């Protein structure tokens, strides 16, 4: 999982990526291509 400062660029890497909020943190999840997962620090 990649740790990034801005999730805007992480979301635009794949069309299926979506932003979710869990436990006060923002995550990018991608069901079709899980290597695009990211979390905002």
From Swiss-Prot:
Key words of the record: Ribonucleoprotein, Ribosomal protein
Gene Ontology cellular-component annotations: ribonucleoprotein complex; ribosome
Superkingdom of the source species: Bacteria
InterPro entries registered for this protein in UniProt: Ribosomal_bL36, Ribosomal_bL36_sp, Ribosomal_L36_bact
Gene Ontology process terms (BP): translation
Annotated PROSITE patterns: RIBOSOMAL_L36
An MF annotation (GO) of this entry: structural constituent of ribosome
Keyword Ribonucleoprotein: yes
Family recorded in the similarity comment: Belongs to the bacterial ribosomal protein bL36 family.
Name of the protein: Large ribosomal subunit protein bL36B
């Amino acid at each position: 999982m990649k740790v990034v400062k801005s999730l805007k660029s992480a979301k635009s890497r794949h069309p299926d990526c979506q932003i979710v909020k869990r436990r006060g943190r923002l995550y990018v999840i991608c069901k079709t291509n899980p290597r695009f997962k990211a979390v905002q620090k």
